[in-house]
Amino acid sequence: MTRKNNALPKARTLIEALPWLTRHHGKTIVVKFGGNAMVNEELKGAFARPSFLVHHAGLRPVVVHGGGPQISAELDRYGLVSEFKAGLRVTTDEAMDVVRMVLAGQVQRDVWGCSIVHGPLAVGITGEDAHPISATRHRPLIDGEPVDIGRVGEVTRIDTGAVLALLEDGRIPVVSSIARAEDDGHVYNVNADTAAAALAAALGAETLMVLTDVEGLYEDWPNSDEVISRLTASELETLLPDLSSGMVPKMEGCLHAVRNGVRTARVIDGRVPHSILLEIFTDDGVGTMVVPDEPSVSEGTS
């Protein structure tokens, strides 16, 4: 193949990306980066490079991270038992000290560390810094009864001031999913999927992207590995009761986002090279995309 022909695929890629670059320029995207990906060095690098590329392409990325595996490992090291109820970690006062230490002192530093090689743009904050995330104690229902799971928070308010200030300064905010209560001052462990969705809605983000270690939302798991490529908010709401516990907070987050002003929410496989770029800048994309319901005829003509 000649040098000219070698360059043609690159030109086609740029042509395909151009309308998406134009559409997304100046828009905010919120990317939830899971703790599972942080234990894989290759995935960390694959996440950092595209994040900086979309920044330099004119988008405004905000990263929200979890740290489940790292928290579990540290709890084990301290001899504290990891217990889960309703898919959420039971967080005692002692466990909360570990959660704060791991999310703000270890995982966030890791995200920042793999990002800094691409430029001094990432700035780490938690839900305690200038209170971007406020929460109250969350009591999930199990068999119809509320259950106390300790210092686990339900988001009550998002203050976008600190995040917007960083974005206006050309930075990439990296947010740990810890929140402080407005009433009693307690600090809570907030599910990172939930925090990312609430932040995306408050920022009026163009899209919420949830990076995970599966291909997307499966149509009939475990009977089929067929991935649903696109569904509406109402279609997703119908599926929620039958989803696996691990997918529920991710898909609930997507549902909350698109019903509160976010144009699209996507669950994508972080193991796929350049998955963020493929989802944003190509016609096909990867993973599962959730979109708002189409307005009814009466809504459209009123």
Swiss-Prot record:
Domain of life: Bacteria
A Pfam family assignment: AA_kinase
Main location: cytoplasm
Keyword Amino-acid biosynthesis carried by entry: yes
Record's keyword terms, sorted: Amino-acid biosynthesis, Arginine biosynthesis, ATP-binding, Cytoplasm, Kinase, Nucleotide-binding, Transferase
Assigned protein family: Belongs to the acetylglutamate kinase family. ArgB subfamily.
Record's function text: Catalyzes the ATP-dependent phosphorylation of N-acetyl-L-glutamate.
Protein name per its UniProtKB record: Acetylglutamate kinase
